[in-house]
Structure formats: C-alpha cells, structure tokens
Amino acid sequence: MMLRLTTMRPMLLAAVAVMRCPSAVAFVRPPTLRYASGVRHAVSSRRLPRMSSLMEDVMEDTAPVINAAGADVRVRFAPSPTGTLHVGGARTALFNFLQAKNAGGKFILRIEDTDEARSSRESEESMLADLRWLGLEWDEGPDKGGEVGPYRQSERGEIYKEMADKLVEAGWAYPCFCTEEELIAKREQAENKNEAPQYDGTWRDADPAEVKAKMEEGVPYTYRFKVPKGKRIVIQDLVRGQVAWDAEATVGDFILLRSTGVPVYNFCVAVDDAQMGITHVVRAEEHLTNSLRQCLILDALEFPRPQYAHCSLILGEDRSKLSKRHGATSVGQFRQQGFLPSAMKNYLSLLGWNDGTEKEIFTEEELHEAFDLRRVVKSSAVFDMTKLKWMNGQHLRALAVEELVPMVGSTLVEAGVCKDAGGPFVMSAATLVQGSLELVTDAISQTQDMLGYKFDETISSEESTELVGDGFSEVVAAIVADFDAGEMPKPGAEDFSPAFKKWIKAKGKALTRKGKRLFHPIRLALTGSMSGPDIGEQLKLLELASEEGVENVSLAARIETLKAWLATQE
C-alpha cells in the first residue's frame, strides 16, 4: 500500500514542537544503504546543518556522485504500467541492458505504479512479455525479487514513509495548507506578471502554532520540499555534458507528498534509486528537469547521486515526437508485424548510438561488447520504418533456415495457407522466400504468389511487352509440346533438380537462346511471373503443396492456360 499522510501526523506534531524550541532540534543520522551486491555504501554520518543557515548561504554543489569505476554497475528500467511498451521505452530499456552487459553489472526492473487510477497489472504483464521477447532479461525485478525490493512502488510505502519522516525531522520538508483554489490564484498572478508560476512559500516559514492549529482542525495539507536559497545543482551528464540549475529560481518549493498521502513521482524515484544502489540513470531527455528535484532530495538525505545519461527523443519522419499517428509505435505491434527481436534491438541501438564506424548490422554479442554510453549522441534520432524493414531483412537472411522454418510455418498456418507448420512444404517455402523477406509476414504473400498463377495478368502488362514480342509464343509452344510428350522432368522425381536444369539447357540449344532470352520466357510461362526464386524449386513446391493438401495451381493446369493463350496467337 502507498504511504498515507495520516500515518505521519504524530511525527509532524513532534516536529512542530521542535519548531517552537529551536535549541531542542535533534538531527537525524542519515541512513546507510545496503546494495544487492552485498557492498554497503555508508552515507556520511555528519549531522545535517541547521536549516536557517542552510537557506541563507549560497551553496556550492559539492554533492558526492557514485564512483562507477569503484562500484558494481547497477542500472534500472522503470516503466509505468499504464499502457503498452513504446519503442522509446524499449530503447531506454535496451541502453540500460547493454550498459549492464558491457560493464558486467546488473539490470534492474522497477515498476513505477504510483498512478493507481491508470496503472494495471495487465499492462505490467504486457510490458514484461515485450521485454522478454526483446531478450532484455532483468537480474532483479517484481517477479524475481532481490535484496533491495520490493520492486513495485505501490509496495514500498514504508520505505517512503521512513524517508519522508527524515526530511521533516531534519527541516527539509514542511506542511502546506494551501487549497487548490489558492494555488490557481497564485499561478495566475505570476503569469500576469510574466513570472514563472512557482509556489511562493506561503507556509515555508509559518508560525508553528498556526501549523499545529491547522493540523488539529484536520485541514488537508501536502508536504513540500524546502529548496535551499542560493542552491545551484550541477550534474555531469554522460550524454549532454554539464547541466546546471539555480534550484530556487527553477522549481521553488515542490510537493513531496500529496494531500491524499501518496508520494509524488520525483520523491519515489530519488528514494528508489538510492535504496536500490543505482549507479547510472539512463533515460530520455524529457526527464532531465526531474534530475533537479531528485538531486535536491538525494542531497538532503545525503545519498550519493547516480551518474545521469539523458538520451534525446525519438522523432517521426516529420521531425515531431514519435506517436501513434506515425504508425506502429509499440513493441507488441512490431512483434505482430513479423519483426525479429534481434533486428529491433539492432535498430533501436542505433537510434542515438554508434560504435564509431560505419557498421550497421550487429549481433547481440557484438552489441554487448561495443556499447558505450559515451558514444550516445545529443541529437534526436528519426525513426525510419524503411530502414528498420531493411535491417530486419538482413537479420532474416542471416538465420539458418532451420531457425526460419518455425517462424514461417506458424505464420503460414495462422494465415490459413497450410496446416502443417513443420512439414516439407514449409521447409521448401521458407528456403525460397528467405532471400526476399523483410518481414516474416511477407512469407504469406510470397508463398501465395508461388502457389498461384497470374499468367494472364502478367502477359497483358506493359512489363512483359518486350518479352512477348521476342518470340515468346515459340518458347511456350516448345514447353507445351515437351509436357504433352512426357519429355519435361516431373517435379516429384528424386532427380528433378538436375534433370530440370538439363532440360532448360537443351531448350536453349533447340531454340538458339541463352541467358535472359531463355530463362525469362520460361519463368513467365511456368510461374506466371517476371521474377522470383528458382523456377525448378517453385515447381517442386507445387508438388509438395499437392501432397500436403495445400491449394495451388498445378503444373498441368498451367500448361492448359498456356495452350489457351497459344490459341489466341494463331
């Protein structure tokens, strides 16, 4: 269950008592974090400074950052289960996964489900299935456990309560009783003055007696973080270089806990990253401004900051942020369309990263070895569907036919082309289409084209005009004559392939044709197409189709079509 504000009322009343008597302030000792590797990262035990002096001084940003060279790399992917896994999220997961693989570290899966209204376990399961399809297996997560769990934010309420207590006790957080109407009015006033709409600190230094009275009346309140005056936050982003903010001018005192008692996103993330020992936070640039709030929280709790790497957004071909209007955007959609997980990973890895060469096709092992966050670029990447399909085709052609057959077989069975997903027919079809596939689903139309016979359509097309005018009827007549005389090799014979090649060679001599003038008319006559896989292998496919009860236009039926066409040429 999520932390509820009412559980903190006794603690806050005690804090109000302390506010009445500053000399009685009892500072808390910062906690020690235990990491899954068994290494304990002790946070400095020095007492926190008094808030009065802290707020008055201009502070240099000297917060400690985790030394990646001296600690086991721990990265995380933290999706919100409110929909499907978007390709942008998949790329973030991939970059984290590859960083862990390259460094011999751990890849953590954390579910950020604090939005109770929109989050669902169904969405979570869908995302986990998509990650597994991509081969991005995590080392710790909600279904695997680990030493720093729970791994769902909705189950980490006690942890957030403990950290919130520490912030309040140390003077880093305070209750705000402003109503929504008052906050709206403040925003409007700021906008009318052309000022940034920030909280004006109404309750920041409120009289403790007034705070206590409000609480005893049961007036709803939020907790706000007390942003230090003059505080400058600086991070050395691994992608974007140095990024700095004037904290007070940028965010003002922000909410930590809502009036419902539910912690806000940035508070949960900061606490989780620290408690889980995350060394590198790799995420999209839209989270860059969140780093300011998270660093303030981490600094207040005296936790070391992780290394940040904010990757540019993925854009559509019109240079706007990739969205549904650009077509498929979820991993599940690409999976259904027939893309390979290896191709998806290869393509997504190149959306913002390269290995410093012109190399584009990577195996999974090569990606594990080559990936380096320092080679992720600042500029936005454009999602090019044509390039993705080309890359998928490269990966399909790199498969052993034994790996391709199950994919093609299940695809053809699902489409109703055949019933046996692993028989000789599918083996033959997979072998024939492998060289021209971009998607596994392309096997459906390409196989159906080979089983069908579009002779009449092709012969009347402009594409075939030159071929027909070059004595095509003479070639057709020779084919028909040989078939009727039993001189054309039968596709079902064991020696069909060499016999068919020998037969074509003999036809070339008899008709004084060779090369394209020989093969192109024979292809059109026997397959009904101007291009395609090996002619003889296509005829063998027809025989296998007939044996397995797969609908096709047989060789005999094709010969009858040729005879009918010849009759029109007399």
Predicted regions mapped to residue ranges:
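Hydrophobic, well-ordered secondary-structure elements that form the walls
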Residues: 522
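Aromatic-anchored, charged helix-turn/loop surface patch used as a conserved interaction hotspot
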Residues: 423-497
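Catalytic adenosine-cofactor/nucleotide-binding cores of aminoacyl-tRNA synthetases and other
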Residues: 289, 302-456, 527-570
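Glycine- and acidic
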Residues: 75-81, 108-113, 276-281, 329, ...
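N-terminal Rossmann-like or analogous alpha/beta NTP/dinucleotide-binding catalytic cores
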Residues: 54-192, 289-303
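N-terminal mitochondrial targeting presequences
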Residues: 26, 40-60, 68
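Active-site cores that bind ATP or allylic diphosphates and position pyrophosphate for catalysis
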Residues: 174-310, 316-322, 330, 355, ...
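N-terminal chloroplast transit peptides
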Residues: 1-38
